[in-house]
Every structure is written in structure tokens, then in C-alpha cells.
């Protein structure tokens, strides 16, 4: 008997006052996979993540998640001068169980230390969060989601702007989480990363253009539909053309 999916999205439409962000989106997210959300700016990637998280109210349709959900937001350059250590930030993941006003018990501190070690940040546990690089902060936020013991992990552009070693290390962490049976959904603009690192790709442009293995979802025809024809073949590699470029 096949396992039930981790999450099911049926006929999801999300409309804001001035625009419709998602239109009749339906998909099933299996257990134990890394799913890439790919699409142009304004395609609805972040809106879909928020719908899965439960922080966006659908205008129509439904979202069902079997298990707990953790969210890793985009990491900006500012706002990191708070007097918090990496361990303090990771420990915030326990507040769902303990509440914000209670002192976390020792077991929660152990869980936070284990999560930091799992993302390769154990040796930085006592460092102030503002002293860490962007890639290191991203790992700390992932550790916070792990402390939540989330079954469905949602990440908003975690490898954007990362150097090659950081991207590889982060991707290896996601693969390990997948192998533990978690479902990992990653919003990204990086076609090469999604093709190499994701088990499934959901290509969005306000609606689902394609959903399946990267070789199918990221073929030239699907990409042209999602990006308005701004896709060119460079030495056998499909890339997004710069604005104003015309493919021959």
C-alpha cells in the first residue's frame, strides 16, 4: 500500500486586492523528497510556501498537511544585531512546545545543540548571530526548523547568492533530511541547482506549468511557457536569457 502524501494541495487559488497570486493549483507532495519550486518573479512561489505553512488564507481550494511544518525564510543582510547566539535562535524552534514565556527545559537545549550539529554549526553555537555569514545564518534558521521536529520543511531561496561550497554543503544537508523521510520544499531561481539537487520540480507561473522529475518539468517547452520564451540553449544547457536577448 502506497504511503499517503505529506501534503495535498487541491484547486488552490490565492487572490490579493490587486492581483491573483495562485490560480487553481493542485499537487501532491510525497514523503521523503526534495521538491524545487521554480518560476519567474511573481510566479507565486512564496505564496505557495505560505499557503503550505498556513499563514495565507486560500480564496478557493484547500491545503492539507500530514504532520508539522517548519519554515526557513530568506536571509537578508540587516537586522542581525540582536543579542542572540546561534544556540538561542535554534532554541526558538522549541517554543511551539514550551511557549514563548516559559524557560525551555534541558531536553530542548539538547535538541537545539543536536540540530546545530546536524547542519554543521555546532562549533558556532555561542557566537552572536550577527557575527555569522549569510550562509551560516541560513543554516542556523534550518536548525531552528529542525528543533520544531518538522515533517514538512519549507525554504524560501536558501541558496540564493551562496558560493559553491556553501551551496554544496546546504544541498547535502537537505538530501540527508530527505533520506530521514522529511519532505523538503525549496523555492529557487536556480535551474541548474534544481535539476541537480531536486527529486521533483514544480514549475510555477501563477499556476502549475509542470510537476514531476526535473528532466520533465524543466524541459525547453515548459520553461518557455513559464518564462515567456526567455529560454535559450547554450551548449546543451538551458538558461534564462537576459532581458532583451533574442534566441536564434
Spans of model-derived segments:
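Conserved ABC ATPase signature
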Residues: 128-132
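Conserved ABC ATPase "signature" region
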Residues: 106-124
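Conserved switch/coupling elements of ABC/ABC-like ATPase nucleotide-binding domains
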Residues: 206-216
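Helix-to-loop junction immediately C-terminal to a conserved catalytic motif
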Residues: 53
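ABC ATPase nucleotide-binding domains
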Residues: 219-248
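Catalytic Walker B motif of ABC-type/P-loop ATPase nucleotide-binding domains
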Residues: 153-157
Amino acid at each position: 500500500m502506497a504511503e499517503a502524501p505529506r501534503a495535498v494541495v487541491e484547486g488552490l487559488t490565492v487572490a490579493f486586492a490587486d492581483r491573483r497570486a495562485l490560480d487553481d493549483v493542485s499537487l501532491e507532495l510525497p514523503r521523503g523528497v526534495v521538491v524545487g519550486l521554480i518560476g519567474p518573479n511573481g510566479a507565486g512561489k512564496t505564496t505557495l510556501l505560505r499557503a503550505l505553512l498556513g499563514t495565507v488564507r486560500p480564496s478557493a481550494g484547500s491545503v492539507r498537511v500530514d504532520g508539522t511544518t517548519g519554515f526557513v525564510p530568506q536571509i537578508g543582510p540587516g537586522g542581525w544585531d540582536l543579542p542572540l547566539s546561534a544556540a538561542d535562535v535554534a532554541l526558538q524552534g522549541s517554543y511551539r512546545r514550551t511557549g514563548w514565556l516559559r524557560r525551555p527545559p534541558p531536553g530542548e537545549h539538547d535538541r537545539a545543540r543536536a540540530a546545530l550539529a546536524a547542519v554543521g554549526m555546532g562549533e558556532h553555537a555561542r557566537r552572536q548571530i550577527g557575527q555569522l555569514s549569510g550562509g551560516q545564518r541560513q543554516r542556523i534558521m534550518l536548525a531552528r526548523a529542525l528543533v520544531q521536529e518538522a515533517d514538512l520543511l519549507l525554504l524560501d531561496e536558501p541558496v540564493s547568492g551562496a558560493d559553491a561550497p556553501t551551496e554544496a554543503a546546504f544541498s547535502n544537508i537537505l538530501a540527508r533530511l530527505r533520506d530521514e523521510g522529511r519532505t523538503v520544499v525549496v523555492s529557487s531561481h536556480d535551474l541548474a541547482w534544481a535539476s541537480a539537487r531536486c527529486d521533483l520540480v514544480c514549475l510555477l507561473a501563477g499556476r502549475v506549468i509542470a510537476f514531476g522529475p526535473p528532466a520533465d518539468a524543466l524541459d525547453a517547452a515548459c520553461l518557455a511557457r513559464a518564462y515567456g520564451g526567455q529560454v535559450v540553449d547554450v551548449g546543451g544547457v538551458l538558461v534564462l536569457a537576459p532581458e532583451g536577448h533574442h534566441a536564434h
